[in-house]
């Protein structure tokens, strides 16, 4: 798969529109997320490992906010022969179209239902694994608990939710430190100060990170009895919750 370089914010613009997962972003998303999210490849690979451990035969897997299908592909590689179905959902037509191309490039006996729609409208049932990989942060904060409740209800006992998010910190010095470390990560991956600044402006109104404790409290309040942070690099984290 050819990966185009992300130069979306390389030219100065007087008006920065809110970030959207449109055709421009879909075309460079693989490069964008690799250069922007520390540990992304490890997260994707480990989601596959979790699938191998937790996915039961004849159950369903949900990848909510599937983007180009990286998590779905990682899962599918690990669950051959289990007669499972993956439901991969994204609300961006451009992302879904490119995701379908990526899925078509690999042969598998695991069916994938690729849905262009709102993850809040998806019926979740008979699930052994649900993935929210850098998705919840883009939902309105008031809708997040309702979605987590729906996921919990749709998971079978022993099923898991993998939740990856950018997080924020109540401790101001820690927030500043880890935010600066993340900016250094982006600089080291070739993003200019202009690109970093304009991307930040684009995301300001559409991505609202929670604290780690907010995530944990939300999950436990909806019934998850087992929770752990399993990955963190700077202000990016991935959590696992078991029903």
From Swiss-Prot:
It catalyses: prephenate + S-adenosyl-L-methionine = carboxy-S-adenosyl-L-methionine + 3-phenylpyruvate + H2O. InterPro entries: CmoA, Methyltransf_25, SAM-dependent_MTases_sf. GO terms for biological process: tRNA wobble uridine modification. GO terms for molecular function: carboxyl- or carbamoyltransferase activity; S-adenosyl-L-methionine binding. S-adenosyl-L-methionine binds at residues 40, 65-67, 90-91, 118-119, 133, 200. Keywords: S-adenosyl-L-methionine, Transferase. Its EC number is 2.1.3.-. The keyword S-adenosyl-L-methionine applies. It comes from the Bacteria. It is an enzyme of class 2 (transferase). Catalyzes the conversion of S-adenosyl-L-methionine (SAM) to carboxy-S-adenosyl-L-methionine (Cx-SAM). Belongs to the class I-like SAM-binding methyltransferase superfamily. Cx-SAM synthase family. Homodimer. This is Carboxy-S-adenosyl-L-methionine synthase. It comes from Shewanella baltica (strain OS223). The lineage of its organism: Bacteria, Pseudomonadati, Pseudomonadota, Gammaproteobacteria, Alteromonadales.
